Amino acid sequence: MSRELITKYPQIEDYSTIWMENITHTTAKGSSEFGLSNTNKLIRQYEYATGLKTGSTSGAKFCLSATARKDGVNMIAVVMAEPDSKTRIKDAIAMLNYGFGKCSIYQDEKALEKIVYAEVKHGMQEKAKGETLEGFRYVDTSGSDLSAVEKEVQIQKQTAPVKKGDQIGEVIYRLNEKTIGSVPVYATEGVGE
């Protein structure tokens, strides 16, 4: 549920990281101001914390769905049925630190460093220009040296007509000769017959 919330509604972070806020309550009898503080003490105690939600009842005890971001990696730690608030924070920090210690991320914001072209047979032009619409991200948990990631641009020959937006190739990423992902290359212009 936490992953869905932060993925679909990233603006939740703007609210869940507020430590303390003064609220003005206005009624027919007038207005009064009161301070509202966040029950998620993690946001004050852990430098990478980005939120999210605490809860406690006599049956469920102390629970926390904690989110944090470090070096471009987002983590979620969920602790339930803790005996007290301090323990839930301590255990969430331990889980987040463990996750950050095990994960590293490879990012290639610009999959193509130069303009690429696909050959077009029977077209009004001989080539179709291509580009990627997104970068590439890979999360590694094996401890591999991510500086060893290699990428290869593969562009396929096309037969006219080629429509703008047609996939004409891909950028393939490999680590230790194993494919770890790819990014499609799309035609940025159409080529008629």
Predicted stretch roles:
Residues S2-E193:
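Domain-terminus/edge residues, biased toward the C-terminal soluble/receptor-binding domains
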